[in-house]
Regions:
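Glycine-rich, basic loop-to-helix element that forms the pyrophosphate-binding segment
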Residues: 59-76
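Short, well-formed alpha-helical segments that are part of the catalytic scaffolds
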Residues: 12-28
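A short, conserved alpha-helix in the catalytic core of glycosyltransferases
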Residues: 142-145, 149-154, 159-189
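Short beta-strand/loop segment that forms part of the nucleotide-sugar
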Residues: 30-39, 57-59
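Non-catalytic, C-terminal membrane-associated alpha-helical segments of glycosyltransferases
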Residues: 207, 211-215, 226-281
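Short aromatic/hydrophobic "clamp" motif used to bind/position activated sugar donors
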Residues: 81
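Conserved donor NDP-sugar-binding/catalytic core segment of glycosyltransferases
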Residues: 91-123
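A conserved acidic beta->alpha catalytic loop
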Residues: 25, 36-45
Length: 281
């Protein structure tokens, strides 16, 4: 096996300020499938011109994390794929370390890097050269997928626009006795929370708060039922309502917006509406 057997799948949305750092970190022998959640033809043209191993697909609208990744994954022709966020980057040894990890657990469905963020890079576990360790779920910013393991489970549930889609996928894999691992040897640099241009931070923050609450309720509803999910989110619902009232009284417009988004996301989820909210950018 070589790194040519791995396809990188990246989903982006207005990420032109940061995407090049990610792409520059990837060996040019790897095919990169980039799914851009817009109709930005200049973004596609410039990247495909500068990176010969990149194929950029424009969705025409913002499909979110799960559906856009599914578009990319369904175009993969290699045995393995690496889902990578645009605010993440590879170290020179990342792909070869992944290959050596595969040899220890060839039956894996997902392998994720042990250092889930930069704070963990000096973790003692990384120094021990441990084999991949079985887990029940991993974070979605970087996941190596064994494509053949997904024939009977599918990829992401597209009803989730953002958040909890990787937890849902891991849950479905575990339910079918598929194997998920953390690999201490595999390192990926992840800046976190900045997968888009800084100019749209405020609107993206509103969108994140809405979808975090919507996805929280619907993930638990899907796997535990409506009533259990309602019990789980009720404290969040009450807190959001109280804070909307408080911040309205003291004229804190920014805080009121945030908690209104949380309240709206939960109310829409509880009432059975889909994840319709999109950032206004």
């Amino acid at each position: 096996m070589s790194i040519k057997d791995i396809t990188i799948v990246i989903t982006s949305f207005k990420s032109d300020e940061i995407i090049r750092n990610c792409l520059n970190s990837i060996d040019n022998q790897c095919e990169i499938i980039l799914v851009e959640n817009s109709n930005n033809i200049d973004f596609k043209t410039n990247l495909e011109k500068d990176f010969k191993n990149v194929k950029c697909f424009l969705t025409g609208e913002n499909f979110g994390y799960g559906k856009a990744n599914n578009i990319g994954l369904n175009k993969v022709k290699t045995k393995y794929a690496l889902i990578l966020n645009p605010d993440a980057s590879l170290y020179p040894s990342t792909l070869n370390d992944f290959i050596s990890s595969i040899e220890k657990v060839p039956d894996f469905a997902i392998i994720a890097p042990f250092n889930q963020d930069q704070k963990n890079q000096n973790n003692k576990f990384e120094e021990r050269n441990l084999p991949p360790m079985p887990v029940n779920n991993v974070k979605g910013f970087a996941m190596f997928l064994n494509i053949s393991q997904f024939k009977d489970v599918g990829f992401f549930d597209e009803s989730f626009f953002i958040y909890f889609e990787e937890m849902d996928l891991c849950k479905r894999l575990i339910n079918l006795n598929k194997k998920i691992y953390l690999a201490p040897k595999v390192k990926i640099n992840h800046s976190g929370g900045q997968s888009h241009n800084k100019s749209i931070n405020e609107e993206m923050e509103l969108s994140r708060n809405w979808h975090w609450m919507w996805s929280t309720f619907n993930y638990h509803k899907k796997h535990k039922g409506f009533l259990v999910s309602l019990l789980i989110v009720f404290p969040k619902l009450s807190s959001a309502l109280i804070k909307v009232i408080i911040y309205s009284i003291i004229f804190n417009k920014n805080k009121r917006k945030i908690y209104y988004q949380r309240l709206s996301g939960l109310v829409n989820a509880i009432s059975g509406k889909n994840s319709w909210y999109r950032p206004k950018v």
